[in-house]
């Protein structure tokens, strides 16, 4: 890797940890808060320096448009969208009624026009997060989680799943005899689901996050 200053290495390592933990990079404001910078502008300066050194790629105008370069063991990374792509129109899913599809018309409260560069891969919908069970992964109450519909997910990915009558956001880990849905907050218990349980259905994986007020 290109030689980095100590501060640049801190920023790079923070980005890597965030992607490993949640599947998407931090915002400038989150970098500034974590590393004690005076403002997000200071974080932006370090990001531009890292981009000039060829260790990250930045997508213009996207608060989470950061990709690490030259890293082979980052399974959650995707190619950043090219500038100039048309905006995506994404449905926002509110509360989901038991037994009905998550994208049923009655669950969609509105549509948002979103820049594709906000996301690591093309999402199918936005889900409003309720609660703080994923707080330590940077996912807070009221955030909009970008979700790509999937029927399979890898260990460690953050997923949206239907569990009985509820829809939940958790980290997926396979265990002997089933799967564990892991909360990223010690105040919440993990959930073990037995293999073949009719109560469980995977709805999709997280491919981005929009903080409340960013749209």
Curated annotation (Swiss-Prot):
Residue numbers marked as site, Cleavage: 98-99
DNA-binding feature ranges: 28-48
Superkingdom of the source species: Bacteria
Record's keyword annotation contains Repressor: yes
MF (Gene Ontology): DNA binding; serine-type endopeptidase activity
Catalytic activities: Hydrolysis of Ala-|-Gly bond in repressor LexA
The keyword Nucleotidyltransferase is assigned to this record: no
Gene3D superfamilies: Umud Fragment, subunit A, Winged helix-like DNA-binding domain superfamily/Winged helix DNA-binding domain
One Pfam family in the UniProt entry: Peptidase_S24
Active-site residues, record numbering mapped to chain: 133, 170
Role summary: Represses a number of genes involved in the response to DNA damage (SOS response), including recA and lexA. In the presence of single-stranded DNA, RecA interacts with LexA causing an autocatalytic cleavage which disrupts the DNA-binding part of LexA, leading to derepression of the SOS regulon and eventually DNA repair.
Xref: NCBIfam families: lexA
UniProt xrefs under HAMAP family: LexA
Protein name in UniProt: LexA repressor
Organism expressing this protein natively: Burkholderia vietnamiensis (strain G4 / LMG 22486)
């Amino acid at each position: 890797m290109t030689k980095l200053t100590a501060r640049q290495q801190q920023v790079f390592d923070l980005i890597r940890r965030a992607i490993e933990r949640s599947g998407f990079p931090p915002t400038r404001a989150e970098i500034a808060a974590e590393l004690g910078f005076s403002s997000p502008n200071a974080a932006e300066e370090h990001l531009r320096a890292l981009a000039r050194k060829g260790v990250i790629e930045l997508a213009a105008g996207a608060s989470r448009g950061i990709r690490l370069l030259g890293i082979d063991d980052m399974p959650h990374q995707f190619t950043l969208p090219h500038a100039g792509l048309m905006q995506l129109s994404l449905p926002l899913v509110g509360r989901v009624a038991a037994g009905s599809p998550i994208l049923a018309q009655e669950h969609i409260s509105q549509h948002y026009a979103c820049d594709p560069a906000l996301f690591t891969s093309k999402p199918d919908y936005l889900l409003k997060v309720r609660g703080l069970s994923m707080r330590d992964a940077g996912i807070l109450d009221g955030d909009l989680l970008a979700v790509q519909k999937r029927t399979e997910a890898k260990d460690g990915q953050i997923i949206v799943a239907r569990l009985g009558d509820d829809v939940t956001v958790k980290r997926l880990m396979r265990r002997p005899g089933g799967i564990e849905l892991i909360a990223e907050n010690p105040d919440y218990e993990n959930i073990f689901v037995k293999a073949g349980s009719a109560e469980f259905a995977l709805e999709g994986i997280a491919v981005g996050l929009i903080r409340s007020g960013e749209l």
